[in-house]
Amino acid sequence: MGMVLPALLFALPLVTALVLLVNRNPAVRNTLVRVSALLMAALSVAVGVMYFGHPFKIGVDSPLMRLVMMAVDGLAALTVLYFCVKYKRYLTALLGLLQFFLIVAFEFHSGSYARSVWDFNIDNLAIIMILIAGIIGGLIAVYSLGYMAVYHRKHVDVKDRRSFFFFVVFLFLSAMFGLVMSNNLLYMYTFWEITSLCSFLLIGYSGTNEAIHNSFKALWMNLLGGLAFAMAIAYLGDHFYTLELSQLLSMGMQQMPVEPVVALLVFCGFTKSAMMPFSGWLLGAMVAPTPTSALLHSSTMVKAGVFLIIKLAPILGNNHAGIMAMLVGGITFFFASCAAISQSDGKKVLAYSTISNLGLIVCCAGTGSYEAAWTAIMIVIFHAVAKSLLFLTVGTAEQQLGSRNLESFDGIFNSMPRLSLCMVIGICGMFLAPFGMLISKWAAMKAF
């Protein structure tokens, strides 16, 4: 049973995505999404029960696996190239090609020397991220069924591509599972790039000029982080002959000169988690349908960035990479919080709030202390729950009222009492005792 559950957890959303891509029957799609979401949540819980407190490592590295991963990288690069040429975004295409060719060059130059014994590592942090993606991500997928039906009735000018939408959502979740379980940085890089590509496709779903512009903003910023990731892999493999994240942490704690690798990976985490000055892509994602915003903010995209930085926390602290994380995270937390309280657009309030909380998470992880790292994990958990609920309720209110301006929500308790109750629960979860976000932020102050 050791490898079976993690393999099933990764394969289930991937197979579901492929079936949804070719299926054109709405009834089949609705049933498949609901059943897959239920099974995904059950498998996530099963993995948590089996491995929490008992880390499990798997070694699968082989020339064939390297070839498969390189083929996936190539397919992702070709997809990026296709869209960049189609919309004449040549600098973005250059970023994508640069990192792909860097990985290919590394494989041919140092790939045979740089090895990985344990390619997947299911530790407590991975389990927490699996539960967030599996349960919250599955619920968002189910919510999307009703939301997207109404969305296309109200936006008749937008081509109905729901099969493609759900394909990308489940591919996103599969990549997220692969990413958080990866210990081999080459494998993590592949899943990392798939999440960047999926976010690009979801943000640009409507095909409007604004959606296309914002999707490419997300793409080039995340490709910049992907290039840093590729450089980190090449440096680590070429100088230290390993590709394992766990080995990098061991070398860092032994005071070996791995800080360039750590700094590159932290920078990569900044781009994915929308730290300033890269927060623009997450704000631009609001043009996408509400389920996309909920998915990006709560259970997938931005959580991948903070996941990587939290994983690096043991070797951060009083060094350049740690100081960089604390400084960027702290500045992002402060300025995004100030921006959030000055907005009247409901989604903008939530977006800036997300960015500020991500900044606090990064700042905590940057200290390198055990207490602050676990505080960061607490914020990740409670933020995922509260923010997903708030995005979904605000999105539903927007559909019903035709506006997401907070002033238009006046009287919502009378017109939509059940929705209002869910919204209040989400709001309370963000700042009132005994809900988790208040406890997490109190713990953050104590940790500092």
Name the predicted role of every residue range.
Residues 1-11, 15-167, 242-253, 280, ...:
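Transmembrane helix-loop-helix hairpins at membrane boundaries of multipass inner-membrane proteins
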Residues 32, 188-189:
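Cysteine-centered loop/knuckle micro-motif
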Residues 139-188, 198-448:
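Hydrophobic transmembrane alpha-helices and their helix-loop junctions in integral membrane proteins
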Residues 193:
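Short phosphate-coordinating micro-motif centered on Lys-Gly-acidic
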